[in-house]
Amino acid sequence: MRAPNYARPLLLSILLGATGLTPAHAQGRPFLEWAGELSLVRSGGGDTTWQISRVAGGVQEDGRYGWTLAGEHHRRGDLGDWVGQANAFRRAGVWIVSGGVGLAADPEFIYRQSLEGELARIVGRGFVVHGGYRYLRYRDATVHMIQPAVSWYLRGHEVQARGFVVRNATTDEQSGTVLLRANLEASPRVRLAAGTALGTRIFDATAIRNTNAEAWVVFGFARIVVTPHFTVVAGAGGAHEEPMFDQRTLSLGARWTF
């Protein structure tokens, strides 16, 4: 029996952003990284665990360009899915273009195909405006996501507000979420990050119809540069979505830069 759940990962994508710097601040040379996530989940009155493991490698060159190839294994209870991903970005003057693709073979709960792209422009005084789109094709649904955002960079710190306008084309359901996050350079070796998201159907774009499915997410991370080549990230977070979903998550990641 296939899982009727299209939930998105809570923390892993944010963990990866904390492991390496954002494209506008990427530091050069090839890298390898690993990330893992363990969640205690209560859904529909039952308790289960979700796990994500990720290995990746790529290149980032001084904020000018970069690419990443990754493999992920997602497990929810007794069900497991594998997914392959490729992402890249390129900066040209004040413009930054990025995109990615994800593919899974005969998945139980994760998407079959994912396509995304974003165009960002540096507008001055540390501000960057973004416009993004993501297409997600599941076994039983097609989801479109529009993602406007604005970021502010100041002396190594960053604040971002990002919106998610989500439409399930299969059921014609729509939802929206706002994500606020910030990271700061506490010291040359330590970067701290935290954020929150508020909205509806954050975890399931095909949530129970005729319900508000109001949801929230909170998270925090610490990124520590152990050596010039080795970085670790530890994080924690929690989430709730009406009427009956709760999640508590711990994450750990590491990156080796050559």
Model-found features: residue ranges?
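Residues that define the transmembrane beta-barrel architecture of outer-membrane proteins
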Residues: 49-53, 80-84, 93, 111-115, ...
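Detector for outer-membrane/organellar transmembrane beta-barrel domains
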Residues: 121-202
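Outer membrane beta-barrel transmembrane domains
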Residues: 96, 105-107, 181-183, 189-231
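Outer-membrane beta-barrel initiation region
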Residues: 24-81, 85, 89-94, 202, ...
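Repeated loop/turn-to-beta-strand initiation elements of outer-membrane beta-barrel proteins
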Residues: 30-32, 61-69, 94-99, 125-131, ...
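Transmembrane beta-barrel strands of outer-membrane/channel proteins
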Residues: 32-40, 69-73, 86, 99-103, ...
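Residue-level signature of outer-membrane beta-barrel architecture
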Residues: 59-61, 90, 121, 152, ...
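Outer-membrane beta-barrel "beta-signal"
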Residues: 155, 180, 247-258
